[in-house]
């Protein structure tokens, strides 16, 4: 089973396209929607929904994946639920770059201070990070610097921030999922 979390643009047709691409490596792809506007509510909702779909599945190796803000949540929720994560161009600091776009961006900072101390050290090797060199939203050299001590980082030479096409990374995802 692959759990897919959308980014900030929850209505993008690219979400459906990514789900179709993910179905090439796993028939069971679950899309979990969340508001993107209320971080504390989103965290509670995502924890509940992800836990529920894990319980419903008989897959011994489920993974959670997301793009942008969905990558932010995939890393945290996957860690808290004990499953591996694959993140594409994750937004590591929504408390800084979502100001004016969501109601309470400061809640992301509050979530970070209440999260398990040094969770990335405890999650080491359980997240695959795919970063685009052509990301027009974030400086992914900073993202790589923040994550490379904990996770494998794969660079993509073509895709933009929204990562419309993930098919070139599906076999790496499948191998990571089943390892």
Swiss-Prot record:
UniProt xrefs under SUPFAM superfamilies: alpha/beta-Hydrolases
Cited InterPro entries: AB_hydrolase_fold (IPR029058), UPF0227 (IPR022987), UPF0227/Esterase_YqiA (IPR008886)
Signal peptide: none
Coiled-coil region(s): none
Pfam families associated with the record: UPF0227 (PF05728)
Domain of life per record: Bacteria
UniProt-listed HAMAP family: UPF0227
Family indicated by similarity: Belongs to the UPF0227 family.
Name this polypeptide is given: UPF0227 protein VS_2073
């Amino acid at each position: 089973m692959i759990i897919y979390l959308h980014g900030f643009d929850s209505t993008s047709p690219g979400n459906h396209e990514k789900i179709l691409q993910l179905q090439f490596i796993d028939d069971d792809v679950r899309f979990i929607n969340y508001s993107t506007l209320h971080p504390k509510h989103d965290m509670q909702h995502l924890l509940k929904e992800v836990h529920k779909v894990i319980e419903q599945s008989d897959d011994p190796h489920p993974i959670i994946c997301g793009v942008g803000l969905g990558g932010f949540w995939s890393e945290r929720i996957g860690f808290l639920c004990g499953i591996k994560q694959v993140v594409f161009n994750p937004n590591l600091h929504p408390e800084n770059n979502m100001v004016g776009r969501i109601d309470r961006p400061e809640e992301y900072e509050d979530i970070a201070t209440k999260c398990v101390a040094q969770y990335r050290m405890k999650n080491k090797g359980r997240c695959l990070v795919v970063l685009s060199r052509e990301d027009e939203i974030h400086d992914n050299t900073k993202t790589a610097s923040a994550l490379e001590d904990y996770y494998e980082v794969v660079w993509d030479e073509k895709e933009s921030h929204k990562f419309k096409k993930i098919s070139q990374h599906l076999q790496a995802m499948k191998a990571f999922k089943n390892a």
